[in-house]
Every structure is written in C-alpha cells, then in structure tokens.
C-alpha cells in the first residue's frame, strides 16, 4: 500500500476505483462579498480560467468518479457555466458543514472517500487530492491538508497529539495563547470516509 500511495501521489496514477471510490464536493456557495463584483467569485479568472475550472480539473485528475459543486441560491450563471456537471444548492448560508451536507442526498448510497475542497483554491493539485484520498483508503477516517505558515495569524490551527494524529482544528479567534503559536495550519481541504462524513455532520448543531 505504501508503494501504491507513492505512485498515486507522485505520478498522478489516480485510477484506483478498485481500491476506494472517490467523490469530490466543491464548495462554491460563498457569497463572495469581499470581491465587490457582480461576477460570482468562482467564475473570476486566475491564469485565464475561472477558479472553479481549476478545482474541477484537479478533482477529475484525482480520479473522482463524481464531482458535486455546492452552489448558493440564484446562481444561474454558475449553473449555466457548469452545463451538465453535477451540482446542488445550499438554500441558506449556514457555514461550511451545512454546505457539505447539501450534497448528502446525492451521496446517500456512496461508500468511499469524499474529498471536500473550495472553489476558490485554484492551486490545489490532483497530487494533493490523491494523497489525501489515499490516506483514507489506507485506513484513516479523516485526512486534513495542513501547511506550515511563517505567520500563522488568522489561520485555523491543527492541534495534533504525540502520535501525529489530529485532535482538533481551532479557529484563531477561539485558540488559546499556546494554540495561537502553532504554525501547522488548516489548508481547507480534507478527505473523509463515507457514510461517516454525513453521520458526523448530522451531529453538528
């Protein structure tokens, strides 16, 4: 398995449906108010392409058998751009967990790895997604992308135990003084075993 995962991550050999199927949930339901633009945030261009296009391509290159984009109400322009690609609507903006849960009915019978990523992260690669998915396929229930920040101010902190297992993610505003010094921070992408994902989301208040 270690060799398989190495090949998967380094060479983008991502066709491993025989191992564990992947579905990717792309979160594009944010209002994008800070953009101060009539154009929906996911359709703003980076490198000549909409940000959402980069996320979709990365998900497909990581061998996702399904890619579901979560959209806000009144997102006709994004739906038109997506064409026949799968999507769902988050009727009321109630945060990230609620947005992921919007895809629950479409993944009701799915037993595999759910990759969760944001539409406005165009630099996340298929290699990164495949590595996260492989960690879950290898036996973990959840794998979270983290990175070392020179200045961790404002980022969610990844609190790990002595075995390098994730204990919790703490937002900067909720962190203790000690936790605020943690430089390993949340990269905003995770892989979760299904149907465990939605069992956990059902417990979120």
Residue positions per predicted region:
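Conserved N-terminal catalytic core of the sugar/cofactor nucleotidyltransferase
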Residues: 15-19, 49-134
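N-terminal nucleotide-binding beta1-loop-alpha1 segment
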Residues: 19-37
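Short glycine-enriched, charge-decorated loop/helix-capping segments at active-site entrances
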Residues: 39-45, 204-205
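Conserved core of the sugar-phosphate nucleotidyltransferase
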Residues: 76, 124-204
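Short beta-strand/turn micro-motifs composed of small residues
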Residues: 28, 71, 118, 146-147
């Amino acid at each position: 398995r270690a060799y398989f995962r190495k090949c998967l991550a380094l060479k983008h050999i991502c066709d491993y449906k025989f191992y564990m199927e992947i579905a990717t949930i792309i979160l594009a339901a944010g209002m994008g108010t800070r953009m101060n633009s009539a154009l929906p945030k996911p359709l703003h261009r980076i490198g000549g392409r909409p940000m959402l296009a980069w996320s979709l391509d990365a998900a497909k290159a990581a061998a996702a058998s399904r890619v579901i984009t979560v959209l806000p109400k009144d997102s006709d322009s994004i739906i038109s751009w997506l064409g026949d690609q799968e999507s769902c609507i988050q009727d009321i903006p109630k945060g990230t967990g609620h947005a992921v849960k919007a895809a629950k009915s479409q993944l009701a019978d799915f037993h595999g790895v759910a990759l969760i990523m944001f539409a406005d992260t165009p630099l996340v690669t298929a290699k990164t997604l495949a590595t996260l998915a492989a960690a879950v396929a290898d036996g973990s229930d959840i794998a979270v992308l983290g990175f070392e920040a020179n200045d961790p101010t404002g980022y969610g902190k990844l609190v790990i135990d002595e075995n390098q297992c994730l204990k919790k993610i703490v937002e900067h505003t909720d962190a203790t003084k000690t936790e605020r010094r943690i430089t390993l921070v949340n990269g905003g992408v995770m892989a979760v075993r299904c149907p465990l994902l939605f069992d956990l989301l059902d417990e979120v208040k």
